[in-house]
Amino acid sequence: MSFKEFPIMPDKSKGVMLFYPYVSKKSSNNLKRKLSGRWLGQGPMVNKFEDKFKNMFGKKNSAIATGSGTDSLHLAYILAGLKKGDEVITTVFTCTATNIPLLYMGIKIKFADVEKETMNISLESVKKLISKKTKAIICVHYGGLPCDMSGLKNLAKKFKIPIIED
């Protein structure tokens, strides 16, 4: 059965199928090769991927492959210097991956409202929530629509705190 032939509701008792992953034949073959090798995590293929990614964005940058978006955000929070007891502002409208690492790290979350036009974090709401205790602003570019980055950057610069983009 091809991707286009896959029914949206294969079994009415299970509801609407929201996600059906498409994996190309090339990717499937690469995955089979990876799983039949002795390196499941870090190894030659990951090193090759990191090198290619790094070269795409300039040799001065480094690239670290992670197992998931949640892992990537957790690493970003650590690299931003966030620690237990710190306070961050983030959007109320996001995937759990944004907040689970914060909870795991013992960081206090203040939820900002969203703009009704874009569903992105509201700059005005962030302004009301920001304080001397705020250690970062975490924004999510929902549905491919960019947040008001110039406004967020100005606010972050004023309070000397980082912006972490999801």
Q: Locations of the language-model features?
A:
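Generic structural signal for small/hydrophobic residues in well-ordered secondary structure
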Residues: N30-L31, F53, S72, V88, ...
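Active-site phosphate-binding strand-loop segment of PLP-dependent enzymes
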Residues: E117-E165
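Phosphate-binding glycine-rich loop
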Residues: W39, P44-E87, P101-M105, F111-D113
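Short N-terminal helix/helix-N-cap motif within the alpha/beta-hydrolase-1
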Residues: H74, F93, C147-S150
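Conserved coil-to-alpha-helix start sites within the AMP-binding
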Residues: F93-N99
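Solvent-exposed, non-membrane alpha-helical residues enriched in polar/charged side chains
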Residues: K32, S36, E50-K54, H74, ...
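N-terminal "arm"/small-domain region of PLP-dependent enzymes with the aminotransferase-like
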Residues: M1-L40
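Glycine-/small-residue-rich active-site loops that bind phosphorylated ligands and cofactors
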Residues: V23, G41, T94, E117-T118, ...
